[in-house]
């Protein structure tokens, strides 16, 4: 039995309806900042230019690049199983839209998700009339979900995730989150911890088939650029600190200085989580009188370069292919960690900090397989890197274990999720 809509949600929806001028101002501001596509800005208001395809249409929503990467193999597998069905994929960022344009299979197409305004959402849903909706991970915009609840016959939350911080926030609004989650006919969590949190918040049954991100395709890379940089690096010992946050770059630079005592030709590559922080990392290197090159301003990697700052968007796949040792950030600073499957599938041994609540079971499985090691500070990080450089057999064993853990059960995860979803996908001959 569905619970009545809480007063707090009613107030939110009423205020958001009155805030259309604010929503339009926000869109204009984002457009000026380059965060919206000027040719497709109306999609953010729920206004489409392309026609709705005939027949069954399944809507899949993934907010950003990370969720988009998870969506691609899911859509591919669903299309294999149901070639008669079309798929509408929505995301909210320009980067993810570009990714969708490159990788979505035939029978699937992309639209920007409307802003969380009742009229924009209603316009979107009335135009596309999806026969089923699939939300990936944890974007719980009330107007979007509650609007879909009224107009989409079947709704499923897939790869559901609630961070510890969000869990504590939602526990202070139990009726609101329970009402939102009751919009879904089925909830499938990405791991046991998230299944427990979603069960607590929803008060219902939550399934768990494994993390859909395990099935995401490897990050793309320009093979010519990989070869060029590999030639530039030559035989120098080097390592990668990827997806780093403030505080972790200092640890990476301190690690570099520790290792330089034994490896004077060492090269450290830092790829910050947010590329716009490149200048900030340059300043840290300046403070240490380090020779550095900044990729975003075409800084050239030379034999004298001690630090290479990879502060460009969408190129992490290049550096994961280059380096066989990857420290994955977000775990020494308490950000919850980032996806270790990406470097593992591209041939890197994984080092990470203790705060990995976004990927708890993934890291646990990878450590249990011998593909990852936990480090808490620069001393432990330097020790781990030194050990892997010193012992090639240990390094190769760790790389193979990381790759094996990342690739295990991919087919099972996809098939289990597709089985659950296609039970809810109606057959329909016409539009």
Where are these regions (language model features)?
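Acidic donor-binding loop of glycosyltransferase active sites
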Residues: 128-132, 305-335
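Nucleotide-activated donor-binding/catalytic signature segment of Leloir-type glycosyltransferases, i.e.
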Residues: 100, 104-112, 282-310
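A transmembrane-helix-recognition feature enriched in membrane-embedded lipid enzymes
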Residues: 2-40
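Catalytic binding pocket for nucleotide-activated donors in carbohydrate/polymer assembly enzymes
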Residues: 184, 200, 321-405
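C-terminal alpha-helical cap of glycosyltransferases
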Residues: 408-431
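Active-site and donor-binding regions of nucleotide-sugar-utilizing enzymes
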Residues: 24-223, 244-246, 259-266, 273-274, ...
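Anionic-ligand-binding alpha/beta catalytic cores of soluble enzymes and soluble regulatory domains
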Residues: 240-250, 256-257, 266-288
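Structural alpha-helical scaffold elements that stabilize or flank donor/cofactor-binding regions
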Residues: 124-126, 180, 232, 301, ...
């Amino acid at each position: 039995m569905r619970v009545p809509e809480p007063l707090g949600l009613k107030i939110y929806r009423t205020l958001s309806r009155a805030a259309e001028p604010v929503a339009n101002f926000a869109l204009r501001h984002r457009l000026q900042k380059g965060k919206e596509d000027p040719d497709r800005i109306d999609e953010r208001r729920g206004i489409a230019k392309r026609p709705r395809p005939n027949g069954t249409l399944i809507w899949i929503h993934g907010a950003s690049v990370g969720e988009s990467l998870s969506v691609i193999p899911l859509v591919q597998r669903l299309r294999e199983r149901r070639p008669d069905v079309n798929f509408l994929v929505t995301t909210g960022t320009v980067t993810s839209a570009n990714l969708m344009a490159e990788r979505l299979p035939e029978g699937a197409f992309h639209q920007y998700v409307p802003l969380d305004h009742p009229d924009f959402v209603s316009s979107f849903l009335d135009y596309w009339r999806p026969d089923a909706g699939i939300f990936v991970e944890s974007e719980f915009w009330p107007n979007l979900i509650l609007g879909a609840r009224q107009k989409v016959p079947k709704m499923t939350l897939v790869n559901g995730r609630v961070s510890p911080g969000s869990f504590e926030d939602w526990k202070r609004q139990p009726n609101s989150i329970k009402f939102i989650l009751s919009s879904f006919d089925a909830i499938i969590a990405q791991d046991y911890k998230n299944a427990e949190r979603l069960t607590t918040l929803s008060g219902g049954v939550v399934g768990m088939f494994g993390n859909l991100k395990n099935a995401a395709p490897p990050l793309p890379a320009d093979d010519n650029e990989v070869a060029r940089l590999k030639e530039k690096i030559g035989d120098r010992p080097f390592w990668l600190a990827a997806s780093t946050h403030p505080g972790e770059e200092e640890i990476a630079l301190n690690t570099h200085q520790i290792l330089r005592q034994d490896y004077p030709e060492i090269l450290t590559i830092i790829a910050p989580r947010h590329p716009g922080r490149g200048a900030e990392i340059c300043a840290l290197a300046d403070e240490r009188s380090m020779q550095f090159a900044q990729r975003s301003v075409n800084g050239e990697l030379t034999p004298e370069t001690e630090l290479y700052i990879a502060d460009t968007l969408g190129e992490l796949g290049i550096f994961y292919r280059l380096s066989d040792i990857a420290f994955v950030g977000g775990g020494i600073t308490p950000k919850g960690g980032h996806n270790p499957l990406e470097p593992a599938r591209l041939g890197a041994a994984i080092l990470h900090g203790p705060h990995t609540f976004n990927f708890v079971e993934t890291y646990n499985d990878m450590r249990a397989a011998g593909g990852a090691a936990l480090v808490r500070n620069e001393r432990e990080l330097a020790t781990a890197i030194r050990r892997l450089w010193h012992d090639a057999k240990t390094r190769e064993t760790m790389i193979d274990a990381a790759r094996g853990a990342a690739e295990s059960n991919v087919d099972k995860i996809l098939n289990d999720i597709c089985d659950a979803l296609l039970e809810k996908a109606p057959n329909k001959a016409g539009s």
